Design a protein with these regions (language model features):
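Outer-membrane beta-barrel channel domains
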Residues: 1-24, 29-43, 51-307, 348-354, ...
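Short, surface-exposed beta-strand/loop "edge" segments at domain boundaries and coil↔beta transitions
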Residues: 44-45, 321
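Membrane-interacting alpha-helical segments
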Residues: 46-47, 432
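Exposed, low-structure sequence patches enriched in small/polar residues
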Residues: 148, 236-519
Length: 519
């Protein structure tokens, strides 16, 4: 399957082939060394003093050692992620923080072993309200700035019925943005019980908290119990410890699911205290109690057109811990799946939001404190992944914070050939509020070309009016030996708030060379 398909390649069975002359490394080799060398030229006009065509060269080392009984130890020195693809831009029309997925290889490996709470991932654009105790992007990144990773180690694997994950990272300081050298530690342990169930614990430690007043620790326990064929019960309890943030420094959740092919029900009770502060995790919102229920009915009509007809009715009710209503949503979804693999979504939402403080939704557009009720219709058509042109197109229309909102979206993939594809993504919001009118535009274009089974070229261009930015990211990768790579990366960011050609903010050119040695 060509690398240009990305994750969608998992579902492209028609493009699969037969492996011949496959060379497998000897399983007796327990030690892998991967040194790297990198040279770069960078310009950054947002720094003081301005950095212009600054040349740098350095190296580092990754080590992997396969221990007996299914455990793996990883060590990293002077870790570098220059070859990682840039984050996809997002538009935020809520008062809560956005979450960006992890893309760095070191943290992606074994990521599932450390999951607790959350998940932080998005489902069809709907963010989870559950906090994540460990969110790896809190290590080595601060407000978009890279922090040096000096040294790190990780232990992962299974010992009988136990799944083990331990991580320790020492980061350097970044005096220009006021970040101190910090040690991050995470320990995660799960045990299998019954047939398909687990119980576990987690602990995290940050040697210097964000306020610089001491340390930050988090301790928690969770369970996932599976009964019968579709019934499951999950839950967690977790508490943080930060100087000056005592009191409601806890979070807990209980969730019941019974999701069959025809009928389904979900119920969740979630609490996050106002002082809960996992500084190696991610919290979208604090000081709330959530009760959520969803009913699902999915018949399979005996018609030549429709494969199944999904009906979902959900109710989301969120209050502060003192009982004041903050958010409420009634949602109904009708989603027929057609025999050709296409889907059509038609969704009705009735929402209520209470703003406890004024909210600046856009530049010079501030929503006053108070209650806001709204209704909206969402319609989207999803083309099946087997089509040369696939993806989905969506439309939203309805009331919004005392005004109106109209949105159109297209996220797609155009397969020009088995080795060449283009992925356009367009999102435009027209917002009309009593406090002002504005239009938010997000345009992303991705180009992927598979040169050979061991090399590819990709380009990403993004334009976002919300952040007044235009950015590009161009990457070339050549795997000249199994596990050994050459990367060439060019990145550029420009500001678009002034008329005329976008003003250069930063630019970088990187060449990175890695060599895998097995013993």
């Amino acid at each position: 399957v060509p690398a240009s398909y990305g994750l969608e390649g998992l579902y492209r069975v028609s493009s699969a082939g037969t492996l011949v002359d496959l060379y497998l490394q000897s399983g007796s080799r327990t030690l892998e060394l991967k040194p790297y060398g990198i040279s770069s030229v960078a310009t950054d006009r947002t720094m003081t003093p301005i950095v212009s065509n600054d040349f740098d060269a350095e190296g580092g080392l990754d080590v992997k050692y396969n221990l007996p009984k299914g455990l793996t130890a990883d060590f990293t020195y002077n870790t570098d992620f220059a070859q990682v693809e840039a984050d996809d831009e997002q538009v935020n029309l809520t008062r809560f923080n956005l979450v960006f997925p992890e893309k760095r290889e070191f943290f992606l490996e074994g990521q599932g072993l450390f999951e607790f709470g959350g998940p932080e991932r998005l489902l069809w654009g709907r963010p989870s309200n559950a906090p994540s105790v460990f969110f790896s992007r809190k290590i080595g990144l601060d407000s978009g700035h890279e922090i040096p990773l000096n040294l790190g180690g990780r232990l992962t694997g299974r010992l009988g019925k136990y799944t083990i994950g331990a991580l320790n990272i020492q980061t350097g300081s970044a005096n220009d943005i006021g970040v101190k050298s910090t040690n991050f530690s995470v320990v995660r342990l799960r045990r299998d019980i019954l047939r398909r169930s687990t119980v576990g614990i987690i602990g995290t430690h940050r040697s210097v908290n964000l306020a610089g007043t001491g340390t930050n620790e988090v301790f928690g326990a969770d369970a996932s119990l599976a009964f019968l064929q579709n019934l499951s019960l999950t839950g967690f309890w977790v508490r943080s410890r930060t100087p000056g943030r005592e009191g409601r420094d806890y979070s807990y959740r209980g969730r019941l699911e019974n999701l069959g092919d025809r009928y389904g029900i979900e119920y969740e009770h979630l609490v996050v205290g106002e002082d809960f502060n996992p500084e190696i995790g991610f919290v979208r919102r604090r000081d709330f109690r959530r009760n959520y229920m969803q009913l699902q009915f999915t018949p399979r009509p005996t018609t030549p057109l429709i494969r199944k007809l999904r009906n979902e009715l959900s109710f989301d009710y969120i209050t502060t811990l003192d009982g004041r209503l903050e958010s409420r949503q009634l949602r109904y979804l009708l989603a027929p799946e057609f025999q050709n693999g296409d889907e059509w979504w038609l969704e009705y939402n009735k929402d209520f939001e209470f703003l406890s403080t004024p909210f600046e939704i856009a530049t010079d557009v501030v929503l006053p404190r108070g209650p806001y009720a709204s209704e909206s219709i969402y319609s989207a058509y999803h083309l099946g992944p087997q089509r040369p042109v696939n993806g989905w197109v969506g439309f939203i229309r309805g009331s919004f914070f005392g005004g109106t909102r109209t949105q159109i979206k297209y996220f797609g993939r155009i397969e020009l050939s088995p080795i060449l594809s283009v992925e356009p993504r367009i999102s435009i919001d027209w917002i009309n509020l009593p406090q002002g009118r504005f239009t938010s535009k997000l345009v992303i274009g991705s180009f992927n070309y598979t040169i050979s089974p061991r090399s590819f070229f990709s380009a990403l261009a993004q334009y976002n009016t919300s952040t007044e930015s235009f950015s590009t990211n161009i990457r070339f990768r050549w795997e000249y030996e199994p596990g050994s790579d050459l990367f060439v990366v060019y990145t550029e960011g420009r500001q678009t708030d002034d008329r005329g050609f976008p003003i250069l903010q930063n630019r970088g050119f990187v060449v990175k060379f890695t060599r895998l040695l097995r013993f």
